[in-house]
Amino acid sequence: MIAELVSSALGLALYLNTLSADFCYDDSRAIKTNQDLLPETPWTHIFYNDFWGTLLTHSGSHKSYRPLCTLSFRLNHAIGGLNPWSYHLVNVLLHAAVTGLFTRFSKALLGDGYWTFMAGLMFASHPIHTEAVAGIVGRADVGASLFFLLSLLCYIKHCSTRGYSARTWGWFLGTGLCAGCSMLWKEQGVTVLAVSAVYDVFVFHRLKMKQILPTIYKRKNLSLFLSISLLTFWGTCLLGARLYWMGNKPPSFSNSDNPAADSDSLLARTLTFLYLPTKNLWLLLCPDTLSFDWSMDAVPLLKTVCDWRNLHTVAFYSGLLLLAYCGLKNPSLEGECNGKALTNGKQNANGHSCHSDVEYRNSEMKPSFASKVENGIKNCVPQRTQLPSTENIVILSLSLLIIPFIPATNLFFYVGFVIAERVLYIPSMGFCLLITVGARALYVKVQKRFLKSLVFYATATLIVFYGVKTAIRNGDWQNEEMLYRSGIKVNPAKAWGNLGNVLKSQSKISEAESAYRNALFYRSNMADMLYNLGLLLQENSRFAEALHYYKLAIGSRPTLASAYLNTGIILMNQGKTEEARRTFLKCSEIPDENLKDPHAHKSSVTSCLYNLGKLYHEQGRYEEALSVYREAIQKMPRHFAPQSLYNMMGEAYMRLSKLPEAEHWYMESLRSKTDHIPAHLTYGKLLALTGRKSEAEKFFLKAIELDPTKGNCYMHYGQFLLEESRLTEAAEMAKKAAELDNTEFDVVFNAAHMLRQASLNEAAEKYYDLAARLRPNYPAALMNLGAILHLNGRLQKAEANYLRALQLKPDDVITQSNLRKLWNIMEKQGLKTSKT
């Protein structure tokens, strides 16, 4: 028990520095924006959606079905909201628990001694686990490992009690249930059933390959046959249910996720897929270079047989075959053991035990004997199974290393990554056992005390180095900026692009732009990076450049709805209404099939329709606007905030004088967001129009209360007061509005108009002048400034503004009439005019 506690304590201690870490990388989509974690989402949705919140049967789903992990995230969210501390705490505790269970499992193979201790400490400290433990989404791998080990330990108990206790099938039931739970944490958990079969055949029964079929069908080995058959049946059921639940279709991924899968060359695909397990093993052996992402060109394709990395592949598979051969070549010392207690494969008889080299190497746990007397002769009857031989442990370790890794090899279907460090969490158990049993064999082999000490201190040093590397790597996972900077040398395109997002969120605009451009230098066709750079430029009023990058993004990925959306908004603001209309329409017609994030796509499509409706609204095409708004309501995803859309529906109905319908949609807007200020203002106008003055005033005042710094609220309230002939109050509201939003033309212009209506002409002149400076080429602003100057007796300035307005709009009848009246006054006063 001491080994388990110490190993767990080390696993806990090494990851304590992750408790202060933030959400990083995939955590954002799996937790921060995952609607399945929210209390308003029915919890049953977890069992129909994938890990990222997309419907599992959707063509764009990653098919990653991990409901128990998502359920744990939801519990975290219910208790602590989006405080990352609690999420990290659960991950660390799970890792400590897995470490303890792995040490307990190792004890069943290695005995209660130094080598079990070494295996546990190595697993606790291995740096390959940092992504799984420090990254919150890695909880799927850690949770799957927990139930993987529980299932395996239950099966070991089943084997040891088979034929002696009725409870043996209770242990088998535990094996099946834990295997199912492991699969519901992460898909590879189901492979524990295959590992259990390997344990039963090669470790517990110590069969070699050619003995399996003849032995398993013998009557006395019926229990072995039954166990293996049930494991196979249950595994088939789990896999069948899993495939059915995801719609019997494999997931689809982009070229950048797994470039080899998209390669046209069969040779390149074959050589690369054969090489990748070699690269994964190297990460286990020497986890010096780790990265948050290994997609894109992080591992260049092997395109020819002359690529020197093929030597690594040959060496890897040769070593693997050699290990397997060494583990399986020795003949079984007892082929038909039927689970009986063994000492070195032979039943102990007449009280004598045989100590071969194999037994010596496993002498940490000796069999216990109970005395019983038969015919006056005292015999010793073995009570428990002797520890497995080194060869047996090698076979089991290889199965632990290889079988859980098989789903990630692209053997049965293409996966959405090149290398994923967290996928190695379960296979690392086999690796740690292999290293431990190898060190133990070397320790036994050498005779000199100095060499034995060298083996001992070398393994201890390795564990120390692993622990130090883990602590350092945890520092990279403290926040996204540190994580992405650490990944630049491995995957520069992805790392620079993600770093640009972080720098932009920190308002480091020039650094963010530089990061985006660096990402595009390494990979120029990344649609997301082109879009992000365009968005950055748009937000900094560099509209021509932004349009250029949006068009490049659309060219790289024609289904990128958000790029169409922002392109249309820029065109609409530039007055290019027909181009904007075509862009919005094209966006609205893009289907959501095979898209990585269908929720984000639907949101962008809904926003495109909303803006198209606004465009029609501004053109006075209210019926068309309503039709587009209805389509937007039909297409919007459940997480879309609909208050602005509902409010615009109300506006359109109000312009069509359909007041009951308008009131309905204003109320819908307020129901969806009770503090939505535009709905308070528009509904207030409707109430005033229908004679409910006191109610209207309450809504205007509520809007001001919600945001006292918003000039538009004072403007609408002032307009209401003006219509009620409360001129003094209206004038105060107008001044307040113009002071707060002195850069907003509409607010300033309307304030000036209200002050003029309140006969406060001097104040009105001040704001008409400001409005004309905000829009120097807007005829109405110049005409109104001319009119107030005319009223205030500043005739020559009034003439100049009238003339400028007529240059911009020569056929304006009101301006022409005002100018003629002005000239008459100027002539009467003997002032020079520009009439001639």
Curated annotation (Swiss-Prot):
EC number(s) given by UniProt: 2.4.1.109
Transmembrane segments: 1-21, 78-98, 108-128, 133-153, 169-184, 185-204, 221-241, 313-333, 393-415, 423-443, 450-470
Gene3D superfamilies the UniProt entry points to: Tetratricopeptide repeat domain
Listed name of the protein: Protein O-mannosyl-transferase TMTC2
Gene Ontology CC entries for this record: endoplasmic reticulum membrane
PROSITE patterns in alphabetical order: TPR (PS50005), TPR_REGION (PS50293)
Pathway: Protein modification; protein glycosylation
First and last residues of every TPR repeat: 493-526, 527-560, 561-594, 606-639, 643-676, 677-710, 711-744, 745-778, 779-812
Catalysis: reaction(s): a di-trans,poly-cis-dolichyl beta-D-mannosyl phosphate + L-seryl-[protein] = 3-O-(alpha-D-mannosyl)-L-seryl-[protein] + a di-trans,poly-cis-dolichyl phosphate + H(+); a di-trans,poly-cis-dolichyl beta-D-mannosyl phosphate + L-threonyl-[protein] = 3-O-(alpha-D-mannosyl)-L-threonyl-[protein] + a di-trans,poly-cis-dolichyl phosphate + H(+)
Ranges in the topological domain labelled Cytoplasmic: 99-107, 154-168, 205-220, 334-392, 444-449
Compartments in which it is found: Membrane; Endoplasmic reticulum
Organism: Mus musculus
